[in-house]
Design a protein with these regions (language model features):
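Bacterial N-terminal signal peptides that target proteins for export
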Residues: 1-10
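N-terminal signal peptide c-region/cleavage motif recognized by signal peptidases
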Residues: 17-19
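An amphipathic, aromatic/His-enriched active-site/gating alpha helix that lines ligand/cofactor pockets
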Residues: 24-27, 58, 62-70, 84, ...
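Acidic/histidine-rich, surface-exposed loop or edge segments in extracytoplasmic proteins
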Residues: 28-43, 87
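Hydrophobic pocket/interface hotspot
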Residues: 36, 48, 89, 99
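N-terminal, post-signal-peptide region of Sec/Tat-exported proteins
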Residues: 41-88
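Short, solvent-exposed mixed-charge patches
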Residues: 144-145
């Protein structure tokens, strides 16, 4: 009798376990997209465009050449509504950097730019007079299996 009950229990357990394999989600995690929202004061788009075409591009191209990011984009908000940013700065990477990776990258980037964190902070402060960071988002692309 116990063998019959155990066999029935095992069969029931297997019946519920088998569909779990087929219940895998049809998507998997892909690249990470970091998006920064940028608002620019009226009359200063050219000033910020100069920064994007100069120091920003140089740093992003270096990061891409080192494999830290896969790509980057500058997206303009064409049909901007009230309180929305003018631009979105997007960087795409295959993983989120660890604290140790961030520290090593900062040192390498500063050497490449012949700069240091205090100089970078000062330059950012100068841009903050007309450029405002509204926030950032970290998104992960979902890919079909």
């Amino acid at each position: 009798m116990n063998k019959v009950i155990m066999a029935a229990f095992a069969a029931g357990t297997l019946a519920f376990a088998a569909p779990a394999i087929g219940q895998q989600l049809p998507v998997r995690g892909g690249n990470f997209w970091e998006v920064a929202e940028i608002t620019i004061d009226d009359g200063h788009f050219g000033d910020y465009a100069d920064h994007l075409a100069g120091a920003y591009r140089k740093a992003e191209d270096f990061a891409r050449s080192r494999g830290w990011i896969k790509e980057y984009h500058i997206l303009q908000n064409v049909h901007k509504r009230a309180n929305e940013p003018d631009l979105y700065l997007v960087t795409v990477s295959d993983h989120v950097a660890t604290a140790a990776e961030d520290e090593a990258r900062e040192k390498e980037m500063n050497a490449y730019l012949a700069s240091n964190p205090r100089q970078q902070e000062s330059l950012s402060g100068a841009r903050a007079k007309f450029r405002h960071l509204g926030g950032t988002m970290l998104l992960q692309e979902l890919l079909y299996r």
